Each structure stands twice: as structure tokens, then as C-alpha cells.
Amino acid sequence: MKYGFIGTGCMGGALATACAKAIGPEDILLSNRSPEKAQALAEKLGAIPADNETITRDCDVIFLGVKPQTMAQMLLPLQPILTGRRTPFVLVSMAAGVAIEALQDMAGGRYPVVRIMPNTACAVGAGMTTYTCSAEVTDRQRQTVLDALAASGLLEEIEEGLMGSASAVALSLIHISEPTRRTPIS
């Protein structure tokens, strides 16, 4: 299983770091519009620097860590690669405000998509990530993504309609779970 991160800025880098802790760095490929940034993170984690095309062609799980306003531009040249794939893959988007259907349109097909709303505390295992899956995501793909994110902190599935409120939902869940973390069970 190979995991690719297109975009290794604050959020993409934090999730790549968590993923490396969860599954090991040897099957993680990293790319960034500034190749030096991907190279530096790859060296730090023990991962593999790559380009967007290689990640799109070779990875089973493709994390999209680019800004919402550049997502369509980034995906356009990758559409032929996605269309030509014969092996299963899942796209994982952390772009705020980009709905699953819109992302599928940008990618050029009704591909499996997991939409996530993480925070940067994911890098140290103290994050709260809400997620939602498109109908095309299989149970195995869902579990693979969750396993990759396991070291990032808490994970909570919510309806896509709530993704715009994901930060508030995450904070509420943290507050709800806080008393149980402080109160020992007898």
C-alpha cells in the first residue's frame, strides 16, 4: 500500500508526519509545488520525494493538501492519469469548503473521496479530524485511510453537510470526552 501527499504545507505536512508514525515512512510519497519543501520533509520523515504525476499514478491513498482555490488547477493535468488507472485508489481532501461532488468534478470522475477537516495538532497526535466519505468509498478504503490517520489523534465521522461546522463539532467532541479522560473508571 502506498500513500501520497500532494501538498506538504502546514496541514499536509502535519498529516504526512502523523501517517509516517502510524504506518511507517517507507511507503509515503511527498510532493509540493516547491520541490525543496517536499524533499526536506521526506528527509526528515524517511519518506520519498516525488511529483504529482508519480503520486497520482502509483499511490493507493492520495492526500490532497492544496488550497481550495488551487485544487481545480492542480487536478486538471492529473485527470488523464486518474482516468487511466486500473487499480483502486482513494482521494483524501483536506480542502476547506470543497464538497465531495465538486472535488469529483475537478478530478474528472466519480472516484472514491474521503473529505477530512483536520487541525495542525495532528502532527503530534493531539488532533481532532472529522471526516465524511463519498458513496464510492469501500469499507476497506475507509479503514485504510483511518489506519493512516490513527496517529493523528481523534477521528470522527460526520455528515458532509456538517463539514462547514467541523471545527465547532470537533471542539464539542473534545469537550464531551474531556471529563471521561480526567475521571478514572472504578
Residue ranges and their predicted role:
Residues 1-57, 126-127:
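NAD(P)+-binding Rossmann beta1-loop-alpha1 motif at the extreme N-terminus of oxidoreductases
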Residues 29, 122-157, 166-172:
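Short beta-strand and adjoining strand-loop segment in the mid-core
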Residues 175-186:
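Single conserved hydrophobic/aromatic residue that forms the stacking wall/gate
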Residues 15, 35, 44-45, 53-57, ...:
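Rossmann-like NAD(P)(H) cofactor-binding subdomain of soluble oxidoreductases
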Residues 103-110, 154-164:
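Short, hydrophobic/aliphatic alpha-helical segments
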